[in-house]
C-alpha cells in the first residue's frame, strides 16, 4: 500500500510538472506571437531618420533600440489584454463542445488563470516601470561631470525614476487613506505589494474605463464615417465614366490656367528687369532715379501680380479638390460590381446590428441591476472552465459576445483617436517619433486593460474577471456600475440619433428659417 501511494504521489508530481512546463511553453509562444505582430505595427509607424541620425553613435543607437524594444513589448501586452476575454470565452465553449478530446487536453482552467495573471503582471510592469524608464532613459544625458556613455545615463535614469516612484507611492498611500482603504501608518510601505500597488492599478483602470465611456459612444458614430471612406459606395443612377471625364477635363483646364499665369508672371518680371536696366539714370553715388512712367508701369504690374496671386491660390485649391474627387471616381470605376453592390451595404448593416445589440444588452443589464437579478462584476466565486455555457444561445451567443468585444475595442480606439486633443499625438505612417510611440503604446495599454472591465460592466458577457482583474474594489460599488450603464447607454443613443438625424434636422432648420424670413417680409409689406 505504501509503494502504491508513493507511486500515485510521484505520478501526480510528474503530471503537475509536465502541466507547468506545457503552460510556460504556451505562454512563451504567445509572447513571441504577440511581440512579432507588435513589432510589425510599430515598425510601420516609427520614423526611421532617427537611426540614420545616430548611426555613428553606438550609445544613442543602443538607447534607441532598447526604447524601441520596450515600446514593442508594451504594445504586445496591450494586445494580450484585449484578447483575454475573447480567448477565455472561446476556450470555455471549445471545452463544452469537445470535453473528452485528446487535442484540447492542454486547454484547462489553470492555463486561462495563468494567462490572466501574466497579463495583469506585465500590464503593471509596462505601465509603471518600463514606459517611464524608457522615456527617462531616452532623454537622459548623464550627470554633470561624468563621462559620456551608457552607465552614466543609466545612473541618472535610475535616480530620477526612484524619485518619481517615491512621489507616486506616497500619493497612492495618501489617497488610499483618504478613501478609507487603509489607515496611514508609519510602516505603510510594508503593505506596498498587497494594498497600495493594487489600489494604484485600480485608479488607472478606473481612468481607463472613464476614458472609454467618452471614446466608445463617439467611436460608434465615427466608425460609420471610417467605413464610408474606406469602402466603395454603390453607384445609384450615376454615370461614373462621364463624371470622370468631366473632372479630368476641368482639371486639365485649371492646369492650363495656372501655366498661363506663371508664364505671364515670368514675362512681367523680365520686362520690369529690362526696363530698369535700360531706363534708370544715375544721380550720384548710391542713388538711382527711375522715370515716372516706368514707376507707374511697375506699380500697375505689381497690383496685377497681387490679383493673379489670389487667383493662383483659388486655382490650386480647386485643383486639389478635383484631384481628390477624381481619385474617388477612379476608385469607383476600378471597383468590382460585387464590392459596390454587396460589401458596402453588408458592412453598414453589420455595424448597425452590432451597435443595436450593444445598446440592447446595456439596457437589459441596467434593468437586471435595478431588479437585483444581475450580480456586480466583482469576481466572487471559484473559476472553473468548461462546466456550463456563458450564453443562453450556446456557441452562437458566445461567438456574438466575442464579436461585440472586438467591436467595442475597435470603436474605442477609433473614437479615442478622433478626439480633438489626439490629433497631434495620432501616429502617422513613417512619421511617428519615439516619444509619440511611447505615448501611444501607453494609451493602447490603458484602453486594452480597461476593455475586459467595460465588457463586464455593461453586460456584454457573464464571464468572470479572473485574477487581480476581478479584485478591483470599485467594481463592487453598485452606484458606480449602475450610473456607468445609464450614462453609457444614454450617450450612445444620443450620439447615434444625432448622427442619423443631422441631415433631416439641418434641412428642417433651413426650411424654418426660410419660412420665418418670408413671414417677416410679408408682415413688413402689409404694414
Curated annotation (Swiss-Prot):
Phenotype on disruption: Larval lethal. Conditional knockdown in the ovary results in progressive loss of undifferentiated germline stem cells.
Subcellular localization, as worded in the UniProt entry: Cell membrane
Positions on the Cytoplasmic side per record topology: 44-65, 139-160, 216-341, 417-433, 490-527
Membrane topology: Multi-pass membrane protein
Segments traversing the membrane: 23-43, 66-86, 118-138, 161-181, 195-215, 342-362, 396-416, 434-454, 469-489
Extracellular side: 1-22, 87-117, 182-194, 363-395, 455-468
Family: Belongs to the LIMR family.
Protein name (Swiss-Prot/TrEMBL): Protein Lilipod
Gene this protein is translated from: lili
